[in-house]
From Swiss-Prot:
Name of protein: Aspartate carbamoyltransferase catalytic subunit
Pathway as given in its UniProt record: Pyrimidine metabolism; UMP biosynthesis via de novo pathway; (S)-dihydroorotate from bicarbonate: step 2/3
Gene: pyrB
The protein's Enzyme Commission number: 2.1.3.2
Record carries keyword Transferase: yes
Highest classification ranks of the organism: Bacteria, Pseudomonadati, Pseudomonadota, Alphaproteobacteria, Sphingomonadales
Entry GO CC: cytosol
Superkingdom: Bacteria
C-alpha cells in the first residue's frame, strides 16, 4: 500500500478519494498501448496465482479479467461455480476459507448477493477485487467508463452524464454515480418511477422520470439494460412500451449535446433500451471502446493491488 492507493482491496468505489480514482485511471493508461501491440505480454505477475471466483454467470467480465491476468503473466484459474461445493450447500464463509487455504495471490469475485465480496475479503489473506456483487457495486466498470469518458472528452469534471434505464437493479449505475460525482461530473439518472431507487439524490445524482428532459444537453448518455433476472414483480408493462418511453433513438439523441457520447456497459438489448443505429454510430458510440478500456483498467487494478505482495518499492 502507498499514499497513491492505500487500500488492500477494491470492493467498491465508495470511500475512494478523487486522487485515488485518478491514480487508477492513470495506471490504466499505460496498458492501452501494450494491448494494441502485436506482443501483449508483460511478466510482472509471473509466479502469482489469480483466482476468478464467479458465483454469478458472466462472459464479458470474466473474459476481461482472464485476459488481463494472463497478459500480466499470472497463473489464472477460473472457478466454475456450477461444479463447486457451493452448489452442494457450502456456506460463503467456508468457500472463503477454502480459497484462502489455496494461497491465491489475488481473488476476483462476482456474486449475486450484495456484500458477499466484502465478507470474503474479510476472511482471506490476499487482495480481493469486486467484479460485481448483487445491486451493490461494480467498481472496475465505473473505472473503465470514467477512463473512456476522459479519453474521448479530455475531462470528466463539469460534464453532464445521463445514466438511463434500470437504475434500481444496477450496480453499474451506483458505481458510476459514485465515481463520476467524485470526479466532478453532474450525474442525472433517468428511469420510470418503478425502476428508480428511493432517495437516489443522497448519492449526488439528479433524478428524472422524463427521458427527454433528462437527455437535454447531456455530454454523455449511458444506457442500461433491463435486468429481468433481478426483477421479482411487474416493474413495467412490456419491453415494447419501455422502448417507446425510454429507448435511445437517433431522434431522442438529438436532445443531448451535439457531440454527446453514447455508452452502454453491455450486454445490450437492441431495440429495447437502444437502437442499433445509435449503438453502432461510428463517431458517437464508445461501446466497443469501453470493452477495450476494461482490459486496461483490470490490468492496472491487478498490478496495483499485488504490489505489496511483490515487494514493489514504496508499497509496504
Amino acid at each position: 500500500m502507498s499514499a497513491s492507493f492505500p487500500h488492500r482491496h477494491l470492493t467498491g468505489i465508495y470511500g475512494l478519494q478523487p486522487h485515488e480514482i485518478l491514480f487508477l485511471l492513470d495506471e490504466a493508461e499505460q496498458w492501452i498501448a501494450l494491448n494494441r501491440a502485436t506482443s501483449k505480454h508483460d511478466d510482472r505477475l509471473a509466479g502469482l496465482t489469480l483466482i476468478n471466483a464467479f458465483f454469478e454467470n458472466s462472459t464479458r467480465t470474466l473474459l476481461s479479467f482472464e485476459i488481463a491476468g494472463k497478459r500480466l503473466g499470472a497463473d489464472v484459474v477460473n472457478m466454475q461455480v456450477g461444479a463447486s461445493s457451493v452448489k452442494k450447500g457450502e456456506t460463503l464463509i467456508d468457500t472463503a476459507m477454502t480459497l484462502n487455504a489455496m494461497r491465491a495471490d489475488m481473488i476476483v469475485i462476482r456474486h449475486q448477493s450484495s456484500g458477499a465480496v466484502q465478507l470474503i475479503a474479510d476472511k482471506v489473506d490476499c487482495p480481493v477485487l469486486n467484479a460485481g456483487d448483487g445491486r451493490h457495486e461494480h467498481p472496475t466498470q465505473a473505472l473503465l467508463d470514467a477512463l473512456t469518458i476522459r479519453r474521448r472528452k479530455g475531462r470528466i469534471a463539469g460534464l453532464v452524464v445521463a445514466i438511463c434505464g434500470d437504475i434500481l437493479h444496477s450496480r453499474v449505475a451506483r458505481s458510476n454515480i459514485l465515481a463520476l460525482t467524485t470526479l466532478g461530473a453532474e450525474v442525472r439518472v433517468v428511469a420510470p418511477p418503478t425502476l428508480m431507487p428511493a432517495a437516489i439524490e443522497r448519492m449526488g445524482a439528479v433524478p428524472f422520470h422524463d427521458f427527454d428532459a433528462g437527455l437535454d444537453g447531456a455530454d454523455v448518455v449511458m444506457m442500461l439494460r433491463l435486468q429481468n433476472e433481478r426483477m421479482d414483480g411487474a416493474y413495467l408493462p412490456s419491453p415494447r412500451e419501455f422502448h417507446a418511453l425510454y429507448g435511445l433513438t437517433p431522434e431522442r439523441l438529438e436532445r443531448a449535446a451535439p457531440d454527446a457520447l453514447v455508452m452502454h456497459p453491455g450486454p445490450m438489448n437492441r431495440g429495447v433500451e437502444i437502437t442499433s443505429s445509435v449503438a453502432d454510430h461510428p463517431s458517437r458510440s464508445a461501446i466497443t471502446e469501453q470493452v477495450e478500456m476494461g482490459v486496461a483498467v483490470r490490468m492496472a487494478c491487478l498490478d496495483v493491488l499485488t504490489r505489496r505482495r511483490r515487494g514493489v518499492e514504496g508499497w509496504a
